[in-house]
């Protein structure tokens, strides 16, 4: 919650400084924050969400890099209860707000991601498409962490730059 509040405050500061086109970009967990900011702040024109997914609970439950978190939850909470508790953090809860006409959304996902499984990302994409979101989806044949390495980081940077500058 605090990250979204802080992000919205930064948008107000940028607007007071004269900026009229506001974009947000986030990678991995930061893409959830950027998506939540875009969903809740109508001043955002573009959102570039890299390595994102819609269901944070499922990402923690199924992602290989999240095993230690999952282990701490085992026997204490079921996935359905975690989903309910974390619903305010799930981008899938805000598909309608992300589908507003004045917002363009880019999603870049890694087809071999073991942190945010492609099924988690693709379900968000399907829901956004179903809601009529202005959506640009890019799929790279890499994993979550290899996105930060050449040539993927170069390709990703160029795609995000093109999207945000148009």
Q: Each predicted region: which residue ranges?
A:
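Alpha/beta-hydrolase active-site loop
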Residues: 1-17
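The feature captures the conserved acid-bearing segment of alpha/beta-hydrolase catalytic domains
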Residues: 59-120
């Amino acid at each position: 919650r605090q990250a979204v509040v802080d992000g919205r405050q930064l948008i107000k500061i940028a607007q007071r400084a004269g900026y009229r086109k506001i974009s947000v970009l986030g990678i991995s967990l930061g893409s959830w924050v950027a998506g939540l900011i875009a969903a809740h702040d109508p001043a955002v024109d573009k959102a570039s969400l890299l390595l994102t997914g819609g269901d944070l609970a499922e990402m923690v439950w199924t992602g290989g890099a999240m095993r230690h978190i999952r282990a701490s939850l085992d026997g204490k909470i079921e996935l359905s209860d975690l989903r309910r508790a974390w619903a305010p953090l799930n981008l899938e809860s805000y598909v309608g707000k992300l589908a507003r006409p004045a917002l363009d959304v880019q999603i870049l996902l890694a087809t071999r991601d073991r942190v945010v499984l492609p099924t988690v990302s693709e379900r968000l994409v399907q829901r956004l498409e179903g809601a009529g979101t202005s959506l640009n989806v890019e799929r790279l044949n890499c994993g979550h962490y290899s996105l930060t390495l050449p040539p993927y980081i170069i390709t990703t940077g160029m795609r995000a730059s093109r999207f945000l500058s148009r």
